[in-house]
Amino acid sequence: VIASDNCKIMFIDCIRLNTMCQKTCENHKKIIYNLLGVVSEKNIALNEKIEFLSKRTTREKLLSYLYSCALKSGSRTFTIPFDRQELADFLCVERSAMSAVISRLREENIIKSDKNRFTIVGG
């Protein structure tokens, strides 16, 4: 795990967390609810990443990711949370190969891109 910002790690005693306290306090319920939400979001993100990485080519991985971002944003134009190197790392591809694919997709008028802002034009 690599953090992009400074962070703190919190270790949670799962046994204590799974055992409700005597009073069944609201704070305990809220912690469990919030933790379940975080775990659920992480599970969804990991399943999406598996979907991207299961593609065979850099082009397929990239297009799968970009279409997913467009769907999530509800728009053909969207901004991704990565620079080119971070995106290449996320998709487990070489940055130079990915940049070449982006250039070809632009030439084929499938996407428009400016840094981390993309528009799905066709496809």
List the model feature ranges, each with a label.
Residues 19-26, 45-54, 72-75:
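Short helix-to-loop capping/linker segments positioned immediately adjacent to catalytic or ligand/cofactor-binding
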Residues 12, 49-52, 64-65:
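Short acidic/polar alpha-helix capping motifs at helix-coil junctions
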Residues 16, 45, 83-86:
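A general alpha-helix detector
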